[in-house]
Amino acid sequence: MKKNKLKYVVIPAFAAAALFPVLANDNQVKANDDKAVSSSNISKPESTNGKSASALNTNNANETTPTSSLNLNNDVKPTPIESDEVVKPKVPFTIAEYKQKSALELAQLIREKKVTSTELVDLAYKVIAEENPKLNAVLTTENGKIPKALVDEAYRTAKEIDNRISAGKLAANPVDWKAQPFLGVPTLIKGLDELKNGDYTKGVYLNKGKIADKSGPVATEFAKLGFVILGQTNTPELGTRNITDSKLFGPAGNPWDPSRNTGGSSGGSAGAVASGMVPIASGSDAGGSIRIPSSWTGLIGLKPTGHVVKFPLVKTIEDAKAYFEKTGLIEPKTFIEPPKDLKKLKIAYTLKTPLKDLELSEVAKKAILQTVDFLRKEGFTVEEVKEFPIDGYEGIKTYTVGAIGEEGYVTAVKGVTEENKRQLDPATYALGTSSYMGPNANTDISSVKPLSTFIDQMNAFYKKYDLFLVPTNAVTAPSNDKKIDPYVDPEVEEQLYNINKITDPKERFKLLTKQWLPMTRRSPYTWVFNLSGNPAISLPTYLSDKNLPFGVMFAAKNNSEKILLEIGQYFQDKHQFKMNPAIRSTNVSENGNKIGINEDGTKFEYAVPTYAPSVAELPTLDINNGTATIPSKSENSKTTSVKEEKKVLNTNKLNSISKTLPNTGESTNNFLSAIGLSFLALIGLLKRKKNN
């Protein structure tokens, strides 16, 4: 019987942090794991004219502080609890309460008219003004302010929402809470996505001052769901790194320790949520860009099915479920429903990495073993596998071929000279320069495994197991001091800037693959599930002895997002999450409500709403016999049995979600990218034909 042929797509080397996480050499990764420097070492890079290069330069006077009555320079810091007395929330709504609540909780308060969207926008801008100078999570102009056009639009949107709610059914555009579950909630958009009147440099220094004239798919979708967009978040250049730092924007400080990085490439969004600026912020993931920073900042990070995807960083599973249910950025498809009893799921875990010579840090091992112990005590079946299913070194080669000819790199190096080439990230310059030579000019492409190899390997693994548990990263968050934690080896960096002088194609390709290794050794797992397309979720379950958050990751077969979200719900309900106490209290009252803290130290109690999907009766799936009870199907949410999974995996090949790169919005259908992947596709088809 002939096998189904799988499509091939370009996997951009950027767009996620990370296609390939990069650091120093192998010894540095372990030795520097718990080193950090003082926050005074975090500074925005200087441009050639001596001015800060990290700021968004709008080239006009179109910038201001938020137009609210709040004093944005007034420090508000919670004091220690002095009493066990629980009191009602203070009026007006406080910063401490705002930071504690999820997006759905804030939307519920708006719906109940206990607070207005405008008041929440006031509070959000105040927290940004307080936290951003030390974290550099939000993009600002050269004098440290969010562009006036974005601030004005945020207040205009919030006021319009308040008026609609006040008018009720008499409003010209009455509120539909089912369609807009996040109505009035402040948020931030990742800096690589287009936001009208916002930064459109993609972190490239040579693009400094470029402003978007329209909003892209992510900002449009967030507005459709009811969010009020306040501004944009920091990212690395073109999203290439697994940390957030660039010559234009500078490093992002981690709220747990500002001398450390948040991770990348959605690091600014992670810092914004983890510090309480907003309860939710957009992210994108082509190699770990959602999950890596979620792990290092103590958040929840879901990567849906697909190679290149978009999803927000959140602090509650309910917010993730609501977004997953309502977003139009996830293509409607057949999703596998979780079993009625989650303990029927068979879980595998490993302490081995895709890079077979890489040893995990003690923190990573402890995080996994603690999770395994918890699951077994809860009655789950958990088995250890002694070898990772995919060869990471082979996978890196495939990723590199996809990166050569990628449009983002090609565009970035246009017009670059010997004099200004070092204003680009060395990876950007090397991959962009190599793109003009074409993939075949850089390596013998027949020696690179096609994408289908890794998809088939993981599909085989999931025939035996339902979930795969691994550390999200190999180590804790790196330092922002590049002398301690460089993300590219200095010797390799120099070679990358002179790659045009390397005449041997094989040597060029070897250099391009080598430059990823320091990053992949820090984050060896995340990008594998982009390669295979499998969904995965990072959960904030562990704190190191230095009080640094560390996430564990569950991956599953394609279209198992609902199973991953229910596993996350189980961990959340069992109080396994370790988050910044300022944004999510772990204290629970006798009646199950959360307990927060006001600025004066008094406590307040609040209930956590449960998000209910639009489908009233969710189907149940018996994993053991592969049968399902299927109710009437909604448009966007279907169900399937295990017996149908093979058909699902074959029909759900590479869907339209990978036609647009989430970090740049660039089309992958360009000529240079097509050359490299055409060769890979041809090789894959020939090999399959030979085996039939």
Where would I find each of the regions flagged by the language model?
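Sec-dependent N-terminal signal peptides
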Residues: 7-15, 675
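Paired acidic/hydrophobic, glycine-rich loop segments that form the ligand-binding mouth/hinge
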Residues: 229-230, 279-283, 468-470, 537-538
